[in-house]
Amino acid sequence: MGSRSRTPSPSGKRRHHKSKHKKRSKSHHDHERPSTRTDRDKSSEVNNHGRHRERDRDRERDRHRSDRHTERDYRHSPSILKSRKRSSSSSSDSQYSEQESQRSKQKRSRFKKLDEQNQMQVERLAEMERQRRAKELEQKTIEEEAAKRIEMLVKKRVEEELEKRRDEIEQEVNRRVETAKAEMEREMMLELERRREQIREEERRREEDEKQKREELEEILAENNRKIEEAQRKLAEERLAIIEEQRLMDEERQRMRKEQEKRVKEEQKVILGKNNSRPKLSFSLKPGAL
C-alpha cells in the first residue's frame, strides 16, 4: 500500500495532461480573436462541460479515497484483527485478492471512459479550431478581395476625375508656375538689391578706413614735421649759443690783450723811471699771438 500511494495514479496523469491541454487552449484562445458568436458559444459550452467532468472526477476521487480509508480502518481495527487471527490466512488472502481485482477492473473501466471522453473532447476542440481557422482564412480572403476592388474603383474614379478636370488642372498648374516665377523674380531682385547695398556699404567702410588711415598718416607726418622743426630750432639755438660764446671769447681775448699791453707799458714806465739812462723800449703784441 505504501508503494502504491507514492506512485502517481493514471487519473493524476490524465488530470495533469488535461490541465496542460486546457492551459494551451486558453493561451491560444487569448492570443487569437474569435471569428463569430457561434465559436464563443461553443467554447463556453466546452468549458462548462469540462468543469462538470472535473467535478465528477473530484467526486469519484473523494469516493475512492473514502473507500481506501474505510478499507484501511477495517483492516486495522482491533476486532477485525482478532477475527483475522482466528480465521485462516488462505481465506483472507483470497478475499483480499478478489476485492483488489474488482477495484482494479472498476478503475480500468473508469480510466477507459475518461480516456474516451478526453479523446472526444480533443477531437471536438480540434474540429472547432479547424473551423475557426477556415472562417478566418475565408474572412481574410474576402477582405483582400474587397480591398483590391476598392483600390481599383478609387484608381478608376481618380483617372476619370483627372480626365474631366484636365483643362482646369493645366490652368491651375500654369497659374502656379507663373506665380512661382514672379516670386522667384521678386526674390532675385531683392537679392540683387541686397548685394548692391552690401557692396555700397563695403565701399563706404573702405573709404572710411582709407580716410582714417590717411588722417593717421597726416598726423604722423605733422608730428614728424613738428619734431624736425623743433630739432632745427634747437640746432639753430645751439648754433647761436656757440656763436655768442665765440664772440664772448673774442671779446675776452681782446680785453686780456689790452690789459697785457697796458701792464707792459706800466712796467716799462717803472723801469724807465729808475734808470733814466736806458732808452725806452716799445713792446707790441701781434693780434694772432694770443
UniProtKB/Swiss-Prot annotation:
Residues 111-269 form a coiled coil. Residues 12-28 have a biased composition (Basic residues). Residues 29-44, 53-76, 124-137, 249-269 have a biased composition (Basic and acidic residues). Its main location: nucleus. Keywords: Coiled coil, mRNA processing, mRNA splicing, Nucleus, Phosphoprotein, RNA-binding. The modification Phosphoserine is found at residues 77, 79. The keyword Phosphoprotein applies. Residues 1-10 have a biased composition (Polar residues). Residues 1-137, 193-216, 249-290 are annotated as: Disordered. One of its GO terms (biological process) is RNA splicing. Post-transcriptional regulator of gene expression; modulates splicing and premature cleavage at cryptic polyadenylation sites of its own pre-mRNA through binding and regulation of the U1-snRNP complex. This is Arginine and glutamate-rich protein 1.
